Swiss-Prot record:
The cytochrome bc1 complex contains 11 subunits: 3 respiratory subunits (MT-CYB, CYC1 and UQCRFS1), 2 core proteins (UQCRC1 and UQCRC2) and 6 low-molecular weight proteins (UQCRH/QCR6, UQCRB/QCR7, UQCRQ/QCR8, UQCR10/QCR9, UQCR11/QCR10 and a cleavage product of UQCRFS1). This cytochrome bc1 complex then forms a dimer. Heme 1 (or BL or b562) is low-potential and absorbs at about 562 nm, and heme 2 (or BH or b566) is high-potential and absorbs at about 566 nm. Coiled coil: none annotated. A ubiquinone binds at residue 201. GO terms for biological process: mitochondrial electron transport, ubiquinol to cytochrome c. It comes from Blarina hylophaga (Elliot's short-tailed shrew). One of its GO terms (cellular component) is mitochondrial inner membrane. It is found in: Mitochondrion inner membrane. This is Cytochrome b. It holds the Pfam family Cytochrom_B_C. PANTHER family: CYTOCHROME B. InterPro entries: Cyt_b/b6_C (IPR005798), Cyt_b/b6_C_sf (IPR036150), Cyt_b/b6_N (IPR005797), Cytb/b6-like_sf (IPR027387), Cytochrome_b (IPR030689), Cytochrome_b_C_euk/bac (IPR048260), Cytochrome_b_N_euk/bac (IPR048259), Di-haem_cyt_TM (IPR016174).
Amino acid sequence: MTNIRKTHPLMKIINSSFIDLPAPSNISSWWNFGSLLGICLIIQILTGLFLAMHYTSDTVTAFSSVTHICRDVNYGWLIRYLHANGASMFFICLFLHVGRGLYYGSYMFLETWNIGVLLLFAVMATAFMGYVLPWGQMSFWGATVITNLLSAIPYIGSDLVQWIWGGFSVDKATLTRFFAFHFILPFVIAALAGVHLLFLHETGSNNPSGLASDADKIPFHPYYTIKDILGVLILILVLTCLVLFSPDLLGDPDNYTPANPLNTPPHIKPEWYFLFAYAILRSIPNKLGGVLALVLSILILAFIPLLHTSKQRSMMFRPFSQCLFWILVADLLTLTWIGGQPVEHPFIIIGQLASILYFLLLLVIMPITSLFENNLLKW
């Protein structure tokens, strides 16, 4: 008798995706982050669902409903902090996942990569709207500042901002629609992740060497299921430690003050995972220029396959490109630090230099270095 997992219409999809999937024998722990992102998404959807049962999206009661969740709901504090810090874990995994793709040339799978970029935008939009919901000072002013950036769009800018706000300022209409979008988007993300996997399984996984691995495949289960479970356990351990020992480590103290349109916080800044893009935005004195740089800082990922000039796919055997990759990582960490600093000397000039270096590395220096490495192969 044929095994049910190979014949049942639903089971055979799961079987071909997670059990009998032929996988390269040499993929490292850097390939764990896809499954970790799936776990993060499940954690976020489940905790978010339970939070939505007690949350009210009204400007008068939003802040107190979050307080009510933390004080009066059974394990409400745990659900709330799992959700808040789960977002941070989500972005850590996302950045490492994208970094892995850049380093090992996974962007050569065009459909998979482009859907990944779309997923990154969707997750960032969801996180931004979620940050507005507790209706603290940083929620309100963050929403005001970021939505206001759209007014830089010529001709339709100011109308567009008022359309998004649902009025003449960030108010009840804005909060209600942000809650609605924040609730629906994770399901869109889950669907996109399914398509992401679908395209990945059309080509099969990349591997650290960047070479074809058709001659050396192993079944996904048990080898990589066990490997993924180890990653999941580490993720849950880190998240649990964060939630139980220092839940507010990555948050902003200003968000424990209820939103007040008459009182602007001294330093308006987004959550830590947006600081690198925020630093790029602030480093350009012109409003429209800043907005374009902000969008391009993420959208540039979609152009990476076009900028691939090397004869080799992976950076595994390209020492000069490796050095530049780690300079890029250091540059992004610098931008993240600058994004959290006040707009004053010397932070302004450091931010501007780091922003220029970011775009120069990706658009000019790395492609030219790859061409240079191609010539080294001839010697």
